[in-house]
Amino acid sequence: MEARLLSNVCGFFLVFLLQAESTRVELVPEKIAGFWKEVAVASDQKLVLKAQRRVEGLFLTFSGGNVTVKAVYNSSGSCVTESSLGSERDTVGEFAFPGNREIHVLDTDYERYTILKLTLLWQGRNFHVLKYFTRSLENEDEPGFWLFREMTADQGLYMLARHGRCAELLKEGLV
């Protein structure tokens, strides 16, 4: 019985690894550049899900091996932007940022959705967050959302339900 249990655990682990590998994309920076609205966040860490500042939207710009991420937040009714410069890592689709932060593009169709994995080293621990973004301000239920749900089935899921006025202003280039 113990051997069968060990075999099943190893089998599940192998399937998980294969599934994780299959989500790697050959990133084309020019195609993923531009506006993205945050729709959903998943993490097994409640601290991450209860963050005071929630990103409403991102604007990605690429130059050489670098990426500039301009994020917009709603802070007490005012839109606040924050920019961060990251550099490409050895693995395609992975970028390192100051402050022990990393972004990994897990999946994208470039036109409608992207799924990012954010990693933050804080107080000696790695925190992982999966985020689902769309290009559209209105339509959040894209085909990639179901993939996101599958990827995050064992984690906490937080759906963003607000209008996203700051994301709208970012898309229009007004912030």
UniProtKB/Swiss-Prot annotation:
The keyword Membrane does not apply. Glycans are attached at residues 66, 74. Residues 1-22 form the signal peptide. Disulfide bonds join 79-166. Predominantly expressed in epididymis. Pfam families: Lipocalin. GO terms for molecular function: small molecule binding. It comes from the Eukaryota. Keywords: Disulfide bond, Glycoprotein, Secreted, Signal, Transport. One of its GO terms (biological process) is response to hormone. It is found in: Secreted. GO terms for cellular component: extracellular region. May play a role in male fertility. May act as a retinoid carrier protein within the epididymis. PANTHER family: EPIDIDYMAL-SPECIFIC LIPOCALIN-8 (PTHR11430:SF1), LIPOCALIN (PTHR11430). Belongs to the calycin superfamily. Lipocalin family. This is Epididymal-specific lipocalin-8. The gene is Lcn8.
